[in-house]
Amino acid sequence: MTQNTVIVNGVAMASRPSQPTHVNVHIHQESALTQLLKAGGSLKKFLFHPGDTVPSTARIGYEQLALGVTQILLGVVSCVLGVCLSLGPWTVLSASGCAFWAGSVVIAAGAGAIVHEKHPGKLAGYISSLLTLAGFATAMAAVVLCVNSFIWQTEPFLYIDTVCDRSDPVFPTTGYRWMRRSQENQWQKEECRAYMQMLRKLFTAIRALFLAVCVLKVIVSLVSLGVGLRNLCGQSSQPLNEEGSEKRLLGENSVPPSPSREQTSTAIVL
């Protein structure tokens, strides 16, 4: 350790010995898992929170357009399945006509979403959201009716065991008995019943397909409603963002006060 000497007013004064300087260097290396999580967070921020607002608005518009087209297609498929159900035996599902009114409301909701994407605005957004909400409600009602049809009306073909039987006349004659014996081999009961079983399975498959379409309508309506609400919230917050950006630009362009001016003003006040 060295001792320094300081001369004050011609008098030598000894200062305290200087202490040795210690430099602590800490090297910290992050683990690979931490770096991977940071990279995933950066990717998520890039995908879901892009820096530019124009691509985000365009992406929301494409999502609305795709969801609207999907809703229209699901509504058309629902109406087609409703026609197939009406051609089958009587059921509560076919008598309610839920395939037609649920499909029509979903088609209207899809058309509203497309119109809102082409002509954005608050009024169009509110109308599109209301139509989408109505489509969601009707799709849920159709799902409930379809599930009840599967639970409570499991066998719509009540006459399947007797439809393949030939009816006998009240007073059979001798000629009829002879005809029946000769044509009995031509009438194939087993084949008739096999066809009826195929028809039963086909009708059950149509009902199951209609249930799947209704579930898809519920999901698509929920997603479309979420996208529409997000678009409305983005439109309402856009003026606030523009005002904040203008304030930031004005703050950056303002000239900061110089220290000389501050000192001059202070001297004048004193």
From Swiss-Prot:
Membrane-crossing segments per the record: 65-85, 95-115, 127-147, 209-229
Induction, per UniProt: Up-regulated in fibrotic lung. Down-regulated in activated dendritic cells.
Tissue: Expressed in lung and dermal fibroblasts.
Cystine connections: none
Source organism superkingdom: Eukaryota
Sorted UniProt keywords: Differentiation, Membrane, Nucleus, Phosphoprotein, Transmembrane, Transmembrane helix
Cell compartment(s), UniProt: Nucleus membrane
Region (Disordered): 237-270
A single BP term in Gene Ontology: negative regulation of dendritic cell differentiation
GO cellular component, one term: nuclear membrane
Annotated function: May play a role in the process of maturation of dendritic cells. Required for the development of cerebellar granule cells.
Name of the featured protein: Transmembrane protein 176B
Gene: TMEM176B
